[in-house]
Amino acid sequence: MAGTGSPQSEPRVPGVAAEDRRTTLARFLAAASGAHAVEVIGLTPLRGGAIQENWALDAYFSGGAFSGEQRLVLRTTAPTGVAASLDRREEFAVLKAAFAAGVTVPEPLWASDDPEIVGKPFFTMRRVEGTAAAHRITRDPALDPALPAIAEQLGRELARIHTIRPPRADLAFLAPYEEVGPTHQIAGFRAYLDRHPTPRPVLEWGIRWLETHIPPPTEPVFSHHDFRTGNYMLDGTVLTGILDWEFSGWGDPHEDIGWFCCKGWRFARLDREAGGIADRAPFYRGYESESGRSVEPRRVFFWEILASVRWAVIALQQTDRYMIAGERNLDLALTGRRATECELEILMLLDPGGGASGA
């Protein structure tokens, strides 16, 4: 996992000096890994991760299975967050499940809820190389020849994620699909807008359309719920990791497909409907060949509309973190404008009579 420094400081334990924090972290790593001793060489913030904090953790392990210098990531909770996010222990568990299912993810290593180590819950994973910068991936001409193949591989990766099915004892903390399916999500959007001080009539209209077009139930699968460009790493043209699992849970398989294809995640390449990198065909082909399941365009269309509403609500929540909760982060402040972009997309996708161009 790569990135550049941000203005945040090292994770803090109140009343404990930075050097002592590194010592405490080193002791945890030694105990968790079975090493004789560990020296924390570097702990540097990484850009990206709008919901959580990521730190490049370089450490030297003396003895044990990890002997030598290791390049890791420490992932912990941001000062403020989004209510739908899993906690770090839960995210660690879903990352382990994805890793075991053969999904290309950073290998999860160790987790802790002990606030005495870095001040809040965290987990560690191997650091993978490359970039997740969406605008770079979608706009770099050097990548263009490889992007259809990357889209096809991403379709296969998504199908592997969807091989995880309920019930799972290791994922027992996930809410049942009946409590997180489209009906529940739509009700949550409406409740949020009812509390919001600013009227959003286009979102209300989109919500009403969703309420009257919910597709028939389907067998739930494990869904990433934020599978998109910007949440995977590329090292050149090589996919090195699917990232940011904090929203994952049980869902309709078409939900992840609709989210990936939503216009809000094309990053100025609106002509490339699959994540801003390719046409839908290679992405769908990869998914269908790996899963043995056909993609249903009508279901995808419903989930694209829901994705636009959901992204708009998340954008408003991110702005709340800046305006109300006081988290001074420019990215959070700027995210609010995305809500208006989502509203425009809803207007373009749904015709004035309340029907759908894709339904």
Ranges and model annotations:
Residues 2-37:
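Juxta-kinase regulatory segment immediately upstream of eukaryotic protein kinase catalytic domains
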Residues 42-209, 213-219:
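ATP-binding pocket architecture of kinase catalytic cores
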Residues 177, 294-306:
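All-alpha amphipathic helical-bundle segments outside canonical DNA-binding/catalytic cores
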Residues 220-222, 240:
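Conserved protein kinase catalytic-loop anchor
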Residues 222-224, 229:
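Catalytic-loop of the protein kinase fold
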Residues 243-248:
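Activation of the activation-loop gatekeeper triad in protein kinase-fold domains
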Residues 255-292, 306-325:
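Active-site activation/catalytic loop segments of kinase-like enzymes and analogous catalytic loops
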